Amino acid sequence: MKRRNFLRTIAPAVVLPSIINGFSMKAFAEMPLFRGMEALQTETDKVLVIIQLNGGNDGINTVIPLDQYTNLSVARGNILINSSAVLPLTGTTATGLHPAMTGMRDLYDSGKVKIVQGVSYPNPNFSHFAATDIWATASDSDQSLNTGWLGRYIDHEFPGFPAGYPNASTPDPIAVQMGVGVPLMFQAPGGLAAISVSGTSIFNGWTIDGANPAPGSYAGQELAFARSIAQQTQSYAARLTAAANNVTTQSPSYPTAGTNTLADQLKIVAQLIAGGLQSRVYLVSLGGFDTHSGQVDTTDTSIGTHADLLGKLSAAIKAFMDDLTFLNIANRVTGMTFSEFGRRIISNASGGCDHGVAAPLFVFGHQVQGGILGSNPTIPSVVTSNDNVPMQYDFRSIYATMLKDWFCLDQTAIDDIMLQPFSTLPVVNSACCVPPTPVITGSSAVCIGTQNYSVPATAGHTYVWDVVGGTILSGQGTNQIQVQWSSGTAGTVSVTESTP
């Protein structure tokens, strides 16, 4: 299926504050001067949940390289976790987790967590704002892009979005951001392709002031446009409400409401997914990781600010995973964490550490290939303030992996979205993208002559037929073939369906 080209004109986001009982929502769209409709490219019910750790997480005190402990104790003795407190991981003695991350340890030991070591990008930027934009857009460090990698993905799957949406075939928002702010990650060529939601109670009621007709002036056109976006958001709000109302019971594993903001967000995400919302991507966040000072307690390095943050992250993900199982949707959801950069190897005199390069990230879910990808960073015996954890994997390879092995896109589409080719990594079970064995329709009688055989067609897929005892006359590569049987002996017909 080929993509169409659309003429677009970009309009700013329309902000609709405080309109849904504790939730604020933002709707984003383009002025619909030209609209085009086309079926979505890839049929999938899979969901990707992204957890943003704002501030730059200290990877060395998160995934602890025990085999480098002697040199680490010299480089960061005032913040390093005591080796006896580090949580061991099944299958390795060289690496452990922060003692606050018992939930993640349990998930890792059950094969539901992949740790990817040393994630960054070439020539990293140490500015929070610039680095966050790089992760959001998947740009090179010397580029400035105005579209996000997921915005480009959404534009590929739903061309022209958000113009012409919602509609009968796509009634739900494609992406949902829990929290406030403008999500550059979801910026598509035609506008922001996400709805932003914040709050702790689900939707109740909506009113739009549209009784008076808009005047025929430029201001009236702007008012009419704003109303159209409000109506779009109203439609999405109704869908969110319906999905939320479909789920009345969830896992009791979550922390008490209000004590862990990340867990509160993930609980709503699970509720919406289980309730039938067809959104493909959710973005949630946890802040506070810019630990230049006071990272640990001065008397016990296993507790303190960073420990509290990692404890919340771990507890939230574990509760979320428990809930996905409870709601019977675990095989549909994969999650990943990211932070704009890591921290320096050496600590500072303020009980913290400064902006650095690479750090590990977590991929979690029932369909991940558990374990550790990459090696522990090598810590020199003498560490200076200029020494960093080196990059092993480009973060964009993880994005490309999610597009290929989770969302099942072909390589041409991935390269288009990522703007250049990136290798993929063994993170998610690629078998998730193998189509089910098709059921062949056709005569099973032994006879001489021609017979037709077919399977249900999937747009963009190819079909390789194998016939024993007969000859394919036409249709090889398609979902239907005609076969010439030249004898009355038994034969076989089989087919392999392949994605592009």
Language model features with spans:
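Feature for exported/extracytoplasmic and membrane-associated proteins, marking the mature portion
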Residues: 1-314, 319-327, 346, 360-433
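Hydrophobic alpha-helical bundle architecture
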Residues: 323-331, 335-354, 362
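Proline-enriched interdomain boundary motifs that mark the N-terminal boundary
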Residues: 434-442
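A short beta-strand segment in extracellular, disulfide-stabilized domains
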Residues: 448-457
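Solvent-exposed loop segments of extracellular immunoglobulin-like
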Residues: 457-464
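Short beta-strand segments within Ig-like beta-sandwich modules, predominantly Fibronectin type-III
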Residues: 472-477
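Solvent-exposed segments in extracellular or luminal domains encompassing
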Residues: 479-490
